[in-house]
């Protein structure tokens, strides 16, 4: 079904499913869906709740998806594995968390100096991005829809100012995706930590710095209490797209109406998430500054070194992984 027809289905589904004969013919289905994010991140975890509620609404409550925050069923970085293995039918996560399986997962969330939110939307909806993503996901017995974007992100929280490349050397930095490999080339010591575990790691000195999303989430996480230097921009995430992943067998067993309901709910989530961040981030940033955050911009020498290192990194990885090379080439057309 094309997107125009799909959105038409969204408009008519509640009316159609109100017809008793149709409603009675639909089966009762119960799924479980795991999130990579704890409840404290209300937009991130809340997006999964909104998807669940919308699916229920569009199916006359015949199809119910019970949602679980990170840690209740599986850890935040194990969502893909749980969906693939059928431990849960679905999950809401960022594909770049699974870089250890295949670097080709990374461009479907964010690339350093890559696509912003609008460009990601253009690529996924009109440039073959969805098809490329699901080619990869099929290798893991998963079907997925894009389901939210954070918008441009901040550059993270640091215990000390970073004014030169020398000050990056040995810096224990929580960072995701290929940006970790980039900062490693710049001398830092990157590590990937699940969102729920970032604050205690920063508080105990296990890490010296962290990036996450932006003001709204950073205020809720209270990172300003343990690291006051707040950097911009998050040049490794001009936009960051999330996915609603489904076990392939569980998805195949659904009636078409339920598949359409999921697609509609995810399409709405794509637009809703970034608008919520755009509405909340300005006030959250003011509150962070009032709480003691010291805003800083990356020094030009670091930005220039990062650009050079990123070009070299992408070239190296493209030579090693033909699938990554293809995905990268087809995505960058949209910049």
Which residue stretches match the model-derived regions?
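N-terminal secretory/targeting leader peptides
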Residues: 2-17, 22-120, 128-333
């Amino acid at each position: 079904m094309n997107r125009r027809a799909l959105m038409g289905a969204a408009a008519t589904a509640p009316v159609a499913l109100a017809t008793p004969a149709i409603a009675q013919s639909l089966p009762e289905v119960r799924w479980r869906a795991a999130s990579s994010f704890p409840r404290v991140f209300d937009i991130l975890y809340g997006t999964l709740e909104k998807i669940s509620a919308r699916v229920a609404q569009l199916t006359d409550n015949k199809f119910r998806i019970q949602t679980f925050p990170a840690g209740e069923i599986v850890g935040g970085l194990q969502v893909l594995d749980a969906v693939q293995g059928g431990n849960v039918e679905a999950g809401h996560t960022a594909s770049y968390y699974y870089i250890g399986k295949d670097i080709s997962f990374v461009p479907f969330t964010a690339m350093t100096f890559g696509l912003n939110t609008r460009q990601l939307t253009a690529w996924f909806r009109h440039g073959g991005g969805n098809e490329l993503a699901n080619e990869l996901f099929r290798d893991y017995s998963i079907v997925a829809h894009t389901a939210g974007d954070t918008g441009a992100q901040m550059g993270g929280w640091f215990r000390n100012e970073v004014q030169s490349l020398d000050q990056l050397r040995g810096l224990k930095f929580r960072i995701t995706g290929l940006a970790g490999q980039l900062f490693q080339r710049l001398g830092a010591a990157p590590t990937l930590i699940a969102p729920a575990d970032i604050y205690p790691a920063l508080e105990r000195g296990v890490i010296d710095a962290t990036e996450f999303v932006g003001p709204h989430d950073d205020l809720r996480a209270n990172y300003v209490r343990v690291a006051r230097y707040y950097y911009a921009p998050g040049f490794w995430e001009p936009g960051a797209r999330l996915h609603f992943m489904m076990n392939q067998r569980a998805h195949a067993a659904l009636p078409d109406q339920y598949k359409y309901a999921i697609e509609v709910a995810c399409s709405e989530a794509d637009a809703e998430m970034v608008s919520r961040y755009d509405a909340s981030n300005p006030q959250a940033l003011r509150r962070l500054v009032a709480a003691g955050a010291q805003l800083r911009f990356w020094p030009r020498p670091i930005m220039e070194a990062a650009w050079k290192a990123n070009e070299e990194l992408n070239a190296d990885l493209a030579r090693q992984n033909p699938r990554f090379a293809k995905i990268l080439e087809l995505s960058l057309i949209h910049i």
